[in-house]
Amino acid sequence: MREALKIIALTVGLSCAYGIAHDQITARVCIEYFTIGHFSPANIPWTPTVLGLYWGIVATWWVGLILGIPLALCACVGSWPKRSAQELLRPLLLLLAITFACAMTGLVISRLTNFTAPPHLLPMVLNDDQAARFSADLVTHNISYGVG
């Protein structure tokens, strides 16, 4: 039971760390993705750094939990060889590195091609430049969720 909790804590912690790193970049590409595209509590100075920290945790802890519970069950229950959190660290880091590389590739391609998402996916208050940057963030986040 203790090892299962370690595995769940590991996946939640790594997910949050990934989310913070990811959102530190995307908040600087398009702050409107976070301020207009998402509900953010009032009375907080929403700088790109604060947004990246806040959304990096809020948007990813649950992904780590959803992945961690079945991973812990597979690693700790049944007749197959048991796996520790330590043994799972390297494969999880590899998964996050691949996910990050794919997401950043999507971000770069989106920006280089000036991709703009279909209008129904964008807030109406954005100008053309904001729409392209918002679209790049949208692509980057969707790649992270899809690959990860």
Indicate where each model-derived feature is located.
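Hydrophobic alpha-helical transmembrane segments
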Residues: 48-63, 130-148
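Perimembrane loop-to-helix junctions flanking transmembrane segments
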Residues: 32-49
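Transmembrane helix-loop junctions in multipass membrane proteins, especially transporters and channels
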Residues: 23, 27-35, 72, 76-80, ...
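Hydrophobic alpha-helical membrane-insertion segments
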Residues: 10-22, 90-113
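Juxtamembrane non-transmembrane "cap" segments at the membrane-aqueous interface
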Residues: 104-128
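N-terminal membrane topogenic signal
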Residues: 1-11
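Short, membrane-exposed interhelical loops at transmembrane-helix boundaries
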Residues: 40-44, 119-140
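Cytoplasmic juxtamembrane regions at transmembrane-helix boundaries
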Residues: 69-94
